[in-house]
Structures are given as C-alpha cells and as structure tokens.
Amino acid sequence: MNINGASVVVTGGASGLGAATARRLTAEGAKVVILDLPTSPGAQVAADLGATFVGADVTDPDTVNAALDAAENLAPLRALVHCAGRGGAVRLVDRDGNPGSLEAYEGVVRTNLIGTFNVLRLAAARMAKNDDVDGERGVCVLTASVAAYEGQIGQIPYASAKAGIVGMTLVAARDLASKHIRVTTIAPGLFDTPILARLPENVRDSLAQSIPHPSRLGVPEEYASLALHIISNPMLNGETIRLDGAIRMAPR
C-alpha cells in the first residue's frame, strides 16, 4: 500500500509509539490524523508535524467517526495504526484477601480491547468503500504486547485485553479479506515510552538488561519502522509480530 497522498489515522498519536509513527508516516507523504484524548498534547504534536488532531476516546463511536471524517476530508483513508491503550494493575485477590476490582478490570479491557474493536470496525467500514488500488483498499495495524503471551503478576486486565487483540487479528484479516483490507498486529516488548520514563533510572536499566539482544529498551522509531513496513508489504496479513529483542517476561 502506497500511502503517499493518502490519509492515515494514528490513534494514541500524541506520544510514544503513536507519535513516532505519525512522524514517520508524515515524512512518507501521508496526510496524518492524530486521534488521542482531548487532554493529551496531540494538538501540539500535530501542529509540529503539519498533521491534524482530533480529540477522541477510542471507545466512543461518535468521536472516532469525527476523526475518520477528518481523515476522509483530506484524502481516501488507506491506513490505520492503532496505538492507543492504557495500563492498570489488578490482583485476583488483594493483600487483604479481597477479590480484585471488577471495575478496574473492566476499565482496562474497555479501553484496550473494546476500543480496538471499535476503531477497527469503524475504520474498516470506511476503507471498504475505497477504490481498489493494486489489489488493496486499506491496511489496519493494531498494537498488542508481549504481555499477551507472558503477562506478569498484576497484569491480568492488560494481559487479557492484549491477548484479545492477538486473537482478533487473524479473524479480522479473514473477515476483511473479501474487502481487500489487511489486518496485522505488532506486539511490542519493553519500549522507551512515557510510561517507562516515569520509572527510576535503576529500574529502567534493569529492564533493559533483561532483553537478550539488543540489550536496551526499544525506541518508538523502531515500532514506527515496522508499522510502515506492514503497510507497504502486501503479504503481511493476519499475523502478530513480536518486536521485543527476544525477551520472554518473567512472572514479576
């Protein structure tokens, strides 16, 4: 898929993996719409890149559709890179012997899994109306995590939501094959994002040393590079690609 002159929506594009992806896609000639929370720095990031910002919640159809409208006003929507998500720790039984919070679990799953389904279905419906170009109408890149495979203690809402995205990928690719829309997922390992930046330096160093090779945190530009490759390679479809330096997460 050639995205030069096409529109692309990047969710979670105000920071981290999403911001790096928006930057890379803009450099490739795409007309990028950044979808992120209204409270995020997305407007400034978009202004710096010459992109468009739409404040939205990925679980809200109306605001997601507003971002998709903004993209289609620029050019046909040919790609989605869905990076938006959140963390949140829940233990099945807490230190006092109480059951883990159902509300906290639902909140993480709603953003990470329901939000992914919502954005994917709405974007795919737009792409399905595109003209077919070289056998394709659109590409959707989703974001899971290595936690889908090796979730750590306390990560049960995050891990199960990300595992849901992994499970969604092949089914979605098969579902959309007749529409000539591809769906592929990236499962990042430990990346140098704003979430990890809040950790003490010694903790960050320890995390980096746990990665076999290269023994460092991933950088968002490496995620962006893979996202662009997925978009441009027509045989990448229905697969979840680990981007993790061969790490396998320990229980804690």
Predicted features along the sequence, with ranges:
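Catalytic Tyr-X3-Lys loop
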Residues: 86, 98-118, 141, 165
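Conserved mid-core segment of classical short-chain dehydrogenase/reductases
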Residues: 86-106, 125, 129-134, 154-157, ...
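Catalytic Tyr-x(3-8)-Lys segment
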Residues: 110, 202-222
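Active-site helix of classical SDR
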Residues: 120, 161, 169
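Alpha-helical segment proximal to the catalytic Tyr-Lys
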Residues: 125, 173-175
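Residue(s) in the substrate-gating loop at a strand-loop-helix junction
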Residues: 145
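Short, small/polar-rich loop/turn modules that mediate ligand/substrate recognition or access, typified
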Residues: 177, 182, 236-239
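C-terminal substrate-recognition "lid" of short-chain dehydrogenase/reductases
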Residues: 219-243, 248
